[in-house]
Amino acid sequence: MAKKSLMAEPGDPIPRPRKKRYRPGTTALREIRKYQRSTDLLIQRLPFSRIVREISSEFVANFSTDVGLRWQSTALQCLQEAAEAFLVHLFEDTNLCAIHAKRVTIMQRDMQLARRIRGA
C-alpha cells in the first residue's frame, strides 16, 4: 500500500528540477568576464544612430540652413566605437576612484572626479 502512494498518478504535476542558485556576485563576475573577452559593440546600433541623427539635426538647425546631414554607416560605426571606448575608459577610471576611496560601489562623485582629472 505504501509503495503505491509513492508512484506518480496520472494528472500529477511533473516535478521540475530546481534552478541552480549561485552565490551573490558569481553571475556578475561571470558577466564581467564575458564582456571583457568580447569585442562586439554593447550599445545597439539603431538607438545610437537615432541619437546621433537627432543631435546632428539640432546642430544643423541652429545655423538655420535647409541642408540636412546624411551619415554613412561606416561613420556611425566609427563614432560608436569611439563613444564606447570613451565610456569604458571613463568607467575604469571611475572604478579606480571608488577603490581609492576604499569602496567597491561606484558613485556619482567618483565619476565627477574621474572626468575632472581627465579634463573631459
UniProtKB/Swiss-Prot annotation:
GO terms for cellular component: CENP-A containing chromatin; CENP-A containing nucleosome; chromatin; chromosome, centromeric core domain; chromosome, centromeric region; condensed chromosome, centromeric region; nucleus. One of its GO terms (molecular function) is structural constituent of chromatin. InterPro entries: Histone-fold (IPR009072), Histone_H2A/H2B/H3 (IPR007125), Histone_H3/CENP-A (IPR000164). Residues 1-26 are annotated as: Disordered. Keywords: Centromere, Chromosome, DNA-binding, Nucleosome core, Nucleus, Ubl conjugation. GO terms for biological process: CENP-A containing chromatin assembly. It is found in: Nucleus; Chromosome, Centromere. It comes from the Eukaryota. Ubiquitinated. Is degraded through ubiquitin-mediated proteolysis when not protected by its association to the kinetochore. Residues 14-120 are annotated as: H3-like. Its main location: nucleus. Belongs to the histone H3 family. Component of centromeric nucleosomes, where DNA is wrapped around a histone octamer core. The octamer contains two molecules each of H2A, H2B, cnp1/CENPA and H4 assembled in one cnp1-H4 heterotetramer and two H2A-H2B heterodimers. Interacts with the inner kinetochore. Component of centromeric nucleosomes. Interacts with mis6. Interacts with sim4. Histone H3-like nucleosomal protein that is specifically found in centromeric nucleosomes. Replaces conventional H3 in the nucleosome core of centromeric chromatin that serves as an assembly site for the inner kinetochore. Required for recruitment and assembly of kinetochore proteins, mitotic progression and chromosome segregation. May serve as an epigenetic mark that propagates centromere identity through replication and cell division. This is Histone H3-like centromeric protein cnp1. It comes from Schizosaccharomyces pombe (strain 972 / ATCC 24843) (Fission yeast). The gene is cnp1.
